[in-house]
């Protein structure tokens, strides 16, 4: 849906190797200096999501948002939505050890047969049982998901017809 350029642009990252159980994993996470250029999407710097209730967070900066929270429950569903009916859903299922990203209703998805508007899954075999950090970076045409400080990362292009205004967890 862009005239001259359509490719995922990501933030600068620090790459590190860490030993988890018997595996050596590549972690990647935004550089600390990136924080100077980011405003939080809501007043609290880090939220804790509890299993007993949904939380709807307005996105103060629309599609220029950083969302960060601690996930203490094994499974969670997250939805970005706008008034136009566009939506993106992310499901974290630690029981099945998989993250599912669904962008089928994310806005413009039929502009090219090479653009897969469907559902992507990422296996998370070494995810810890306790609380984990979730950070998402949302911009005009992409959503980046960082799980457990970069242990698992997923980047997807999205082209909503208008900015996402809220996140439901």
Write out the residue ranges for each language-model feature.
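Beta-rich accessory regions
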Residues: 1-169
